[in-house]
Amino acid sequence: MLDQELLAKAEANDVQAIFEVAKAYYIGDGVEENNEKAFELFSKVVALDPNFPDVYSRIGRCYEKGWGTAQDLKKAVDAYTTGANLNSAGCHYYLALAYENGTGVVQDEQKAIQHYKIAADLGDTDSMVEMGHRYRAGNGVEKDDVIATEYYRKAAEKDDSNGVYQLARAYYDGLGVEKDVPRSTQLWEKSAELGHWGAQFYTGINYLTGDGVEKDAKKAAFWFEKAAEQEHPDATYKLGALYLDGVGVERDPTKGIAYIIQAANLGASDAYFLAGVTYFQGNYGYPVDKAKAIE
């Protein structure tokens, strides 16, 4: 339920309060999601204060996606441009995406990079990670692992899960920094705690193998389960294997093969054979289904 004091301020035309209520309707936070109401309130913010920078990324997204209003890519770009001129990091990020993909504008990679860089400088972590990727791959910029890693570090310092994950990879591979496996392990676990499914998988692997940490099968199972909850294919397979073997968890072949089959359905190549055999032979209580086995 929305805070009554906030609603009262919004009714009194407090611009910040109107913006907060609009965001609540936009994402369904404390109130049922309502894109039409959100767009109406975002538009009211613009009418009351045209120099309110943060509103333009939301207005732009509404126009771009047709949320609460008719889709209009030109109006979306216009909104992003207005916000970018007011130093909105989000608007620079969405302008970068627009130029990268040619959405509402003529595709222009260099303009995309320009806006990603400005957004990163203004604190947008998605843009920091994107610039890191570009410098690591030499995509539109000269390849430079040191600069790439610095962008990842900046995102990591803001507790961005992907930034922490990419910084962990840099330390593990020695890209732009001296190789440091224990440091990468610490960072992977931090990223895992922040919810990054890839980091949860690698943290599980680290605890299973003792790579950079003391072996702990229970912790491995814990992190594989966290990643499996996000449908990470390989983590789901690993969790199934642990249940089949009783490693880090109480042995439960039924649960184990269920995870294996789920992993196969998610695309984990290691799971295909065992899932196929299960259906072919009718193992673990599953009926014989040779058609599924062949799939």
Region roles according to the model:
Residues 288-295:
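TPR/TPR-like (Sel1-like) alpha-helical repeat modules
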